[in-house]
Structure formats: structure tokens, C-alpha cells
Amino acid sequence: MSSSYITDQGPGSGLRVPARSWLNSDAPSLSLNGDWRFRLLPTAPGTPGAGSVLATGETVEAVASESFDDSSWDTLAVPSHWVLAEDGKYGRPIYTNVQYPFPIDPPFVPDANPTGDYRRTFDVPDSWFESTTAALTLRFDGVESRYKVWVNGVEIGVGSGSRLAQEFDVSEALRPGKNLLVVRVHQWSAASYLEDQDQWWLPGIFRDVKLQARPVGGLTDVWLRTDWSGSGTITPEITADPAAFPVTLRVPELGLEVIWDSPADVAPVSIDAVEPWSAEVPRLYDASVSSAAESISLRLGFRTVKIVGDQFLVNGRKVIFHGVNRHETNADRGRVFDEASAREDLALMKRFNVNAIRTSHYPPHPRFLDLADELGFWVILECDLETHGFHALKWVGNPSDDPAWRDALVDRMERTVERDKNHASIVMWSLGNESGTGANLAAMAAWTHARDLSRPVHYEGDYTGAYTDVYSRMYSSIPETDSIGRNDSHALLLGCNAIESARQRTRPFILCEYVHAMGNGPGAIDQYEDLVDKYPRLHGGFVWEWRDHGIRTRTADGTEFFAYGGDFDEVIHDGNFVMDGMILSDSTPTPGLFEYKQIVSPIRLALTLNAEGNAGLTVANLRHTSDASDVVLRWRVEHNGTRVDAGELTTDGANGPLQAGDSLTLTLPTIVAAAEGETWLSVEAVLREATAWAPAGHPLSETQLDLSPAQPPLRVPRPASPIAGAAPVELGPATFDAGSLVTLAGLPVAGPRLELWRAPTDNDKGQGFGAYGPEDPWINSGRGVPAPSSAVVWQQAGLDRLTRRVEDVAALPQGLRVRSRYAAANSEHDVAVEENWQLSGDELWLRIDIAPSAGWDLVFPRIGVRLDLPSEVDGASWFGAGPRESYPDSLHSAVVGTHGGSLEELNVNYARPQETGHHSDVRWVELSRDGAPWLRIEADPDALGRRPGFSLAKNTAQEVALAPHPHELPESQHSYLYLDAAQHGLGSRACGPDVWPDFALRPEARTLVLRIRAA
């Protein structure tokens, strides 16, 4: 029997049923989910290289026979991925981003082609074979990657398109009573060339399998298109035999009942009093469409999507997408859908001000879109298509422009649109992702435009706008994004000539991927949001991406960790590039997500002082639809981090609730600032009442204002002249040996030693995009210049292996001066460090002057010092920015106040260990020992008013940099306190722009002034 179907470039074959909506029908159905008999073969039977893969005497398709003995097979759950079952018994996952994990030789695949044979029996009721049944269909919602189906030994057909539904007509093969279903699934096929998305390759039947009895007089398909322009319209499309009529449409809440006696009677229905649907007010109406034989239930949302000039409008109002790219991924189940988890995913998005989702890069499980309708999101629904691996071949042979693949690509788009066309949340169709360009993509767009006039078509790779409706880019720099928004810019856009560039500037612009969220970062999110505020053409974007794709794994000794590329011994892989989410694999929100939440909040707050010294609060409602009646403003006043007053305000103005698009200014009660220290006024916008996605009091945004009076200059001890005699070995709570600290507040310590190194972040390791260095990023549209990663530059400069040479240890009056010089082997550059220790009462003053030599041609990761402490130092409280880590280009969500946490809570458990835990703008930090206060360090601003930051860790930055996973960090007998005069920014160069020059740390002289005493 031929196996040519594996390399067939078509969309599938056999008794395939035309694509239709995923409908909630009362027609009889039978779920075939559950335990199936399963075996895994190393290659596909019947292929030239298969050899003796089958047992002696077993023919290629004997597995389909009812007499075949599968009693020795294993049992495997459906839905599932076989590579995630039985601890690797059936192979392991493979992660690639762009690379194909097989030779690029389309449409062929390797002989090593894992093939899973599935068998199960099931009973079909006798009633399904009565005259009231028109057809029996078998539906697969997701199988990776190509599969052949048999029922009772009869070949039914071949399915393709891993994340797309496929139905087969099995009417002739089924019988009353016991039946046998056999499915042969191949991991690799011609279809794999179309599914090169940045994710794990996870074969198997991973979505639902269902048998359906289609009734005589049933409704084959229903599409209720809705519009809203002050009143509502339903434009129905009913696919059914004439004998199915009359057909009735009911919307009980609207008192609507319309009966169509024949297909010719089906016509639009106008509704005067109807509330519109939006992502903020996801108003849905229960509806049904019924014939005598079948009733279909739907939930209708009335909205109109329209592009007017360069504006993308829903219900006549501009949409700003504060979105995320969302893969279907779970640490335990892979792409197997779980409704409770999906609902919590969406609720978490809402809590963090995410209002939009791009379904990267395929349709999700259909129930996910029901939830998006219900909770309220703008959705770009993307087709299951990516051919990114052909980029390495300069797109030669790319299926997007090869006529042999045309039917498969258009079929994929048809099944995408037809399945999900009833969803109010879907406001755009997307042809796919990173598949170059070509005639087949244009054909997909043409089919979509002809089929659905109510939604625009998106595809980022259509740089010139030849066949799509919006201008979309990924990872454009700040200068380039600025030029896209400007009406007076004549700069050529990517892939465009002057005429094409001008045309693209007449369209709505979205960033379909931006602020790549890999590891610690992204930085400078606010720069993009500022441009969205500034230029009407810009409509926001979609963060890459929502969730890390780690797979929960255990070491031989049972230690749990989240695996990424290479952890399963893949031949080729792309490492931890799959760990690039705003939430970690265990759903923990990252500091980057908190930063994003604050920056994109639609309730924007700003505090100012008027001429009389009273605080004014400006509240801007940047929502699409909703007024702010659901928002309460809570203010508080804190003196030196301690709350002294608090109250509430409403967002109502003279004309009632603050409407979408409006702003108002409120005057707060008179606040008396403390004569000494710091007084901070903070205001939070919180939910008045609980919603489907958050409790009452959930914060939406926050702002602060420093009300502190000018403080007298701090009398900082200046370096004194040395005096005769030996340097002291004891100064208050500290003892020294040869100028080095050896005990502090009764505990052994070491340091302080200069630290310029940080464990490189994923962005520090990125080099796919240019570096800014000393160049002005506006000169070349922000592309930067080709350069090694910052991490490589730092290592080449030896910043991770500085050695110390003590030049001088001298006694001071009541103090000690230590002069040292730090440099790396084979480096001509150094850093001079002078420590001045002086005892004043029970306080030990420490002034550290750090001065790099001339000639450093790089940015520094940090400028600071490290203190090695005993391991019983296990936490900290502080007055400064918090409670989460913060960096120069990621400070918007940091609130000045008193914060605290254990050592573990102070750091983020990123999938690949890296720099974490820096807390900015510190006034004081109090370290705990075994949970009790031990040491207090007060940090004073330098001459320019700049305050230091701190971090507390169990491992040195050098140890962290060497560990592939958290569990591979060495056991430590210490805790390490880093006191940083400055830190380098984060950027997003893992896949995006470098650190913006304003936040880059140039080699420069810095000073730390600290006051230390026992707590």
C-alpha cells in the first residue's frame, strides 16, 4: 500500500467534509476521548526506508483490520502528546525556533519518522442508523502532523493541518453496536514544512475526537454575522437542505423570534435596542437557530469592525491593542486544552490590563474563543502556517510561492475562518506568520476577503501591503516606529519603495510582535507606548509572548525543573529561546508583566502640585468603550515609608462618570509633609466591585508624587588625610585584616570588592539585532550596528574575572582608608577604588569612590561592590523602589515605600539563571539573620542625587552565569549582598532593540556613601 500521502503537498484526501463552524448542537454525538491502544514505530510503514519496522508477516495496513491483535500494545490517553507520556518511553520533545529539525528537502521527510498507531473500539446506538440520520461524521480537532483514518477496516481519508479541525464522513463504514477506529499519526510529513512555528514539536492526537450523528433536516452550518451602529443587525447564513426549513432564530433576551420558511426567506434582521459588544464590555446574547431536527446554540456579540483611513475602529471608536501573543502551552500537557487553565490564563491577562490576543501562530482550541468572547478580548485569529526555515535559503522553494502548495495553504485558511467565524472577539484574520511572501498567501487573502467582508486581513510578511489591510511589523525600533507614525516622514519602510512606503503610511499600524519578554526584561516598554499616544496611526501591539514554554521535568534524583531546548538531547535546537513569556512556566507573573500593566493601563493617573502647594490628580480614561464608574481612587500618604493618612475619591465629574476618551482633574485633601525625611503621596485606581476576572479592590494603575521638602545637604565625611601608625583592625561593629573586612556585626564577612559583572540576561546575550554603543540610534532608524552580544563583550573584557591589587592601607582619624586597583588578566584597563571607613558614634560610615581608567570601550553591566555574608542572612526589608526588581529602563511599576521579603522572594526564578533581584533607589536596607533583623545599611544619594540599589542572592553573579538551570546552581555556604551605584538597562536585544542609550551604563566615576550599624 502506498505511503505517498505522507509527502503529498495537498490538504488531505478521502471523505473529507467541507469546513464549517464549531457549533454547540443538540444533535447526538459521542466523545471518543479516553484511553486508546497505542504503539510507536520508529518509521512510517510502507516507505522505502521502513525496512522491517513491522513484525514478521504484518502488512503495512494490517493495523486497520478488525482481526488485528493489539493486546500487547500500551494504553495512551487521547488527547495527549506521546512524547510527554511515560517519562520518555515514546521519545522526547524537540524545540526549534526557525530551524527545521529535518533536512529541508520538500516535500520529503526522513526515514526516522516516529509513527503512532492508535486503536479504539466504541459502540454506536442503533438509533443513529434510523431514517432520521442523514450522515455520521468523525471530527478531529487537532492531530500533529498527518494522519490516516480507518473505520472497521475501511480507509476513510487522510487529515492534515495539526491545529485545524477536520471532519470525515464515516456513514458507510459504521454499523450499529461495536466499531473500530484506527488512526496512524506521522510526526513528520509534507505538512511539517508548513508548521515551523517557534515552539515544541509535539506529535499525537492532542485535541478532541468526536463522532456526530447529523440529522435529516439538520443545520449543516450557521453563521450569524452581527453589526452595531447604534442599533443591531444580524445577517444570517444558514447552510441546510431546503427540507430543513422552516428555521427559527431566537434571541430570548431581545424578545426576538424570526421564522424563515425557506432558504429564500433568510434575510438580515434589524434590532433597535441592543447593547454592543467590546473587549471592555463583552455583552453577549444567548441565541438559537433551530429546525425541526436540530437546534444550534450561539452567543452573539454585536459589533462592527471597520477601517477608515489609517484608523482601525470597532463600533466607530479607535482600538488600541495592548495585547500578547499566546501559544497554547502547558508545562505538563503541552498543547492539550484544559478549560479551567485557559479561563485562568485569560483572567490573569485581564488583571494585567491585557486587552488583546494574537493566537500565535494557529487557531487555539475552539472553546478558548468562547472564553475570549465572554471575558472580552480583541483577537487576531491566525492560520496554522509558518515556513520560517526557508529564510535560511533566502526563501527559495518556499511553499508560500510554490503552486504545488496552493491548495493546502488556501485550505488551511478556509478551515481557520469557517471554524471560528461566529466569534465576536475575532476582529482580524491573520494568514500566518513568518512565511515570506508569495502568490499562495495572496490567494489566501483573496479567499478570506471574498468570504468575510466584516473583518480585515493581517499578515506581517506582506511588507508592501499588496494583499492585506493593515500595516504590521515586528520588533521595529523606536526611531523606525516613530517614522511610521509621522505624516512628514519620507523614510523608506522595510521592503518598500517610496510609493509603497507612502501607501503603508495610510493604513493602521500595529506591532504584531514587540518588547520581546525573554528572561529579565523587557526594558523601555514606555517608549513604544509614548509613540502610540503621540501618533494616531499607531494602534499598539502584541508582546512576544505570554508564557514560557517550559516542560516540567525531573532529574534522576527527583529534582523538578522546567526544560527547554537541548534538555532532551535534540540533535539541533534553539535553547531557551522558548522561554520568553511575561509569565513563567508555572504561571508566575514576571516583573516585566507588572511593568507592562502599569504602562498600558487605560486608567492613567498623574499627580502634580499647584501654585498653592495642593496636590492635583489628573485621571484620563483611555478605554475604548467603558466609563470609569467601576473605578475607585485610593490615596495614601507615607512618611519615610510609614502610612499616616489615606482616603478615597471617585472618578465622577460634574457630568457624572468619566467617559471613555475624557479626563478630569481632582484636588486631593490638604496634605502636610513632614519637616524631615520623605513624604510620598500615592494614588491607586482600583476596581469598585468584583468582576469575572478580579476581586473588588484589584489595582489597575498607580502613581506617586514626592512631597518632601528640600532637605539640608547631608554632611558626608570627606576623605581625611592619613595619620601615622598602623591601620586599625577594629572599627565599631567591623574588624579588618590588611584593609579587608572580616567581620561585621558579629558575623564573618568578606569584601567589599568591586563588581562590574552581572550574570548576563537573555537580552545581554542577544546579538541578532544591532548594538547601539556610542552611536545615536536615530541615525540609522534604530538598527544599531552589527556587534557581538553585550555578554560576549563583557567576558572578553574580563569583567567576570577582575583581580584586586591593594595599593595602600592607611589609618585615618577614627577610620581606615584602603586604595585598590582592579583589572582583568591581559587587560590594560583598570578601575581604581578608594574605601574610606570612619566611625561616628555607633555608625560606621563607608564612602567608596570608583574611578575607571580611560579607554574602556564598552558599557558596564553594573558599577558596585559585593559583600560575602554567612548563609544565615536570609532576607531584607528596605525603603526604596519595590516590591519587585527594577532597572533603569523598567521602573514604572516600582513604588517608593517600605518593602521586604525572603532571599528567595527578592529574586525571580527565571528558567535560565541570570541577573535578577536589583532593587533601585534605596534609602536603607535592613538585612535579616534567620528571620530576625541583623544589619542596617543606610544609603545616601551622591552629589547628583542618584541613589544606589541592592540585591541579595545565594550565589555569586559568576556562579549564576554558568548555570543552565536553577537546580544546577552550586550549593552555597554564603549569601551575597550587592550594593550598586548603577546598573545597565535591560533592553530587549534577545529579539529586538538594544538598551536605549539613555539607560546604558557608560564607564564613569561613581560614589557610594553608606552608613552601617547593627540592627
Curated annotation (Swiss-Prot):
<feature type="active site" description="Proton donor">
    <location>
        <position position="434"/>
    </location>
</feature>
<dbReference type="InterPro" id="IPR032312">
    <property type="entry name" value="LacZ_4"/>
</dbReference>
<dbReference type="InterPro" id="IPR004199">
    <property type="entry name" value="B-gal_small/dom_5"/>
</dbReference>
<dbReference type="Pfam" id="PF02836">
    <property type="entry name" value="Glyco_hydro_2_C"/>
</dbReference>
<dbReference type="InterPro" id="IPR036156">
    <property type="entry name" value="Beta-gal/glucu_dom_sf"/>
</dbReference>
<dbReference type="InterPro" id="IPR006104">
    <property type="entry name" value="Glyco_hydro_2_N"/>
</dbReference>
<keyword id="KW-0378">Hydrolase</keyword>
<dbReference type="Pfam" id="PF02929">
    <property type="entry name" value="Bgal_small_N"/>
</dbReference>
<dbReference type="InterPro" id="IPR050347">
    <property type="entry name" value="Bact_Beta-galactosidase"/>
</dbReference>
<dbReference type="Pfam" id="PF16353">
    <property type="entry name" value="LacZ_4"/>
</dbReference>
<dbReference type="GO" id="GO:0030246">
    <property type="term" value="F:carbohydrate binding"/>
</dbReference>
<keyword id="KW-0464">Manganese</keyword>
<dbReference type="InterPro" id="IPR006103">
    <property type="entry name" value="Glyco_hydro_2_cat"/>
</dbReference>
<feature type="active site" description="Nucleophile">
    <location>
        <position position="513"/>
    </location>
</feature>
<protein>
    <recommendedName>
        <fullName>Beta-galactosidase</fullName>
        <ecNumber>3.2.1.23</ecNumber>
    </recommendedName>
</protein>
<dbReference type="InterPro" id="IPR017853">
    <property type="entry name" value="Glycoside_hydrolase_SF"/>
</dbReference>
<dbReference type="InterPro" id="IPR013783">
    <property type="entry name" value="Ig-like_fold"/>
</dbReference>
<keyword id="KW-0326">Glycosidase</keyword>
<dbReference type="GO" id="GO:0005990">
    <property type="term" value="P:lactose catabolic process"/>
</dbReference>
<keyword id="KW-0460">Magnesium</keyword>
<comment type="similarity">
    <text>Belongs to the glycosyl hydrolase 2 family.</text>
</comment>
<dbReference type="InterPro" id="IPR023230">
    <property type="entry name" value="Glyco_hydro_2_CS"/>
</dbReference>
<dbReference type="InterPro" id="IPR023232">
    <property type="entry name" value="Glyco_hydro_2_AS"/>
</dbReference>
<dbReference type="InterPro" id="IPR008979">
    <property type="entry name" value="Galactose-bd-like_sf"/>
</dbReference>
<dbReference type="InterPro" id="IPR014718">
    <property type="entry name" value="GH-type_carb-bd"/>
</dbReference>
<dbReference type="GO" id="GO:0004565">
    <property type="term" value="F:beta-galactosidase activity"/>
</dbReference>
<dbReference type="GO" id="GO:0009341">
    <property type="term" value="C:beta-galactosidase complex"/>
</dbReference>
<dbReference type="InterPro" id="IPR006101">
    <property type="entry name" value="Glyco_hydro_2"/>
</dbReference>
<dbReference type="Pfam" id="PF02837">
    <property type="entry name" value="Glyco_hydro_2_N"/>
</dbReference>
<dbReference type="InterPro" id="IPR011013">
    <property type="entry name" value="Gal_mutarotase_sf_dom"/>
</dbReference>
